[in-house]
Amino acid sequence: MNDVSVEYQAIEEKDVLLASKADDCHPIFRRAPSSVEFNKLRKRLLRHMRQALDDFSMLSTGKKWLVALSGGKDSYGLLALLLDLKWRGLLPVEILACNLDQGQPGFPKHILPDFLSSYKIPYRIEYQDTYSIVTDKLAQTQTYCSLCSRLRRGNLYRIAREEGCSALILGHHRDDVLETFFMNLFHGGRLAAMPGKLKNDEGDLFVLRPLVYAAEEDMEKFSQAMQFPIIPCNLCGSQDGLQRNAMKEMLKNIERQMPGRKDTMIRALANVRPSHLLDKKFFDFKTY
């Protein structure tokens, strides 16, 4: 049986609001740069997030959200931007940050609790040794990412239910969406990407991706400027040579040769014409 431990920190909402008013920002931004360049970046990311929240009616999904926090640049940025909107009065939901420690060797257990506590962010950290499950089931030559991700998602769903959350919030950005689209196209033989909003198979939880319009490059710059204590995603040593890396390089080359194509591709995913494709399930060619 897997060892399971849970760590909580709960705070009164008013404590965060009082701290925010004191410095005219959420505490997480107290050490943020004051440069014009950073402010433009921050506003751009907030604009993209607000657009996604509106386009996919994310605010209709309930009043308490579980925000997945892996310790990577995207999840840190996601949490900070959500807290920024909440402080501005534009996000009327309760936020609970959640990290699932999957037992990966060398995982620095102190980083996330120290970070979240220092900014009085409500959080839950749970230990579930899914790493051992993955290594037992797969050969060393196989990529762990897919099974690891499925086990992580299942545990996050369970935690969301236990905490009374209506939605699980993930940090996938524009580039993740496009890479997934091309992976499905080239390797899965289907047209599919990552939706901004969906329901889980059981139908009791929403999965939201407020960063679907945000560029990875912007998230990288934001993370560096905010000096988040990044936890690398190569602890298990299974990241090299993945198909996703090939898609990432392909998209970089396309963007280098034809700037602006990534944004065009994202717009295309929201402008589908079933009659111009070949799928009979989505268009009745017999009566056309």
Swiss-Prot record:
Q: Which domain of life is it from?
A: Bacteria
Catalytic function, reaction form:
cytidine(32) in tRNA + S-sulfanyl-L-cysteinyl-[cysteine desulfurase] + AH2 + ATP = 2-thiocytidine(32) in tRNA + L-cysteinyl-[cysteine desulfurase] + A + AMP + diphosphate + H(+)
Q: Name one GO cellular component term.
A: cytoplasm
* Involved pathway(s): tRNA modification
**Keyword Iron on this protein?**
yes
List cofactor names only.
Mg(2+); [4Fe-4S] cluster
Motif PP-loop motif located where? 70-75
GO MF, one term, reads:
sulfurtransferase activity
- Its primary localisation, in coarse terms, equals cytoplasm
Record's cofactor remark: Binds 1 [4Fe-4S] cluster per subunit. The cluster is chelated by three Cys residues, the fourth Fe has a free coordination site that may bind a sulfur atom transferred from the persulfide of IscS.
Question: What transmembrane ranges does the database entry give?
Answer: none
> Which of this chain's residues are annotated to bind [4Fe-4S] cluster?
145, 148, 236
The record's keywords, sorted A to Z, are: 4Fe-4S, ATP-binding, Cytoplasm, Iron, Iron-sulfur, Magnesium, Metal-binding, Nucleotide-binding, RNA-binding, Transferase, tRNA processing, tRNA-binding
In terms of CDD domains, this protein maps to: TtcA-like
Disulfide-bonded cysteine pairs: these are none
Family per similarity comment:
Belongs to the TtcA family.
Q: What does this protein do?
A: Catalyzes the ATP-dependent 2-thiolation of cytidine in position 32 of tRNA, to form 2-thiocytidine (s(2)C32). The sulfur atoms are provided by the cysteine/cysteine desulfurase (IscS) system.
Classification via NCBIfam families = PRK10696.1
Q: What do we know about how this protein assembles, alone or with others?
A: Homodimer.
Q: What is this protein called?
A: tRNA-cytidine(32) 2-sulfurtransferase
Q: Which organism is it from?
A: Bartonella tribocorum (strain CIP 105476 / IBS 506)
High-level lineage: Bacteria, Pseudomonadati, Pseudomonadota, Alphaproteobacteria, Hyphomicrobiales
